[in-house]
Amino acid sequence: MTPSQAKLLIVNADDFGITEGATDAIIECHRAGSVTSTTLMTNMPAAAYAAQRAREHPALGVGLHFNLTSGRPLGAAAGSSIVDSRGGLLNGRDLALRAITGRLRAGAVR
């Protein structure tokens, strides 16, 4: 690859799939040339919509948004130390509190 072919800056848009509106905004930024990649939140309500939009724009790089603090877990997590009493993922503060107080069980994330 010659220096003129190398990408000098990668602009990644976070939270692809969190909502249809956010997903569409990321696609529009990509089409305008300002976003080169994004990370998909696979457990969010608009994840399937985002996956479809990504297929329509194959030049958009899509990676995984590793998410432990928003929405509901994709796998079986009942009774897990990373979920709240309603079955949703803990927010960042509560997850950190469990970790530093020793209440985050090994194997909770797999």
Model-flagged regions — what are they?
Residues 8-10, 35-39, 59-65:
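Structural preference for beta-strand elements that scaffold enzyme active sites
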Residues 73-105:
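Active-site gating loops and adjacent loop-to-helix segments of metal-dependent hydrolytic enzymes
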Residues 61-68, 90-92:
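Non-cysteine beta-strand/loop elements that form the S-adenosyl-L-methionine
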Residues 14-16, 41-43, 65-71:
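Active-site beta-loop-alpha junctions enriched in small/polar residues
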Residues 109-110:
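CE4/NodB-like, metal-dependent polysaccharide N-deacetylase domain
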Residues 20-45:
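A short alpha/beta connector and helix-capping loop motif
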Residues 2-20:
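Boundary/entry segment of secreted carbohydrate-active catalytic domains
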Residues 26-32, 50-61, 81-88:
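Acidic (Asp/Glu)-rich catalytic clusters
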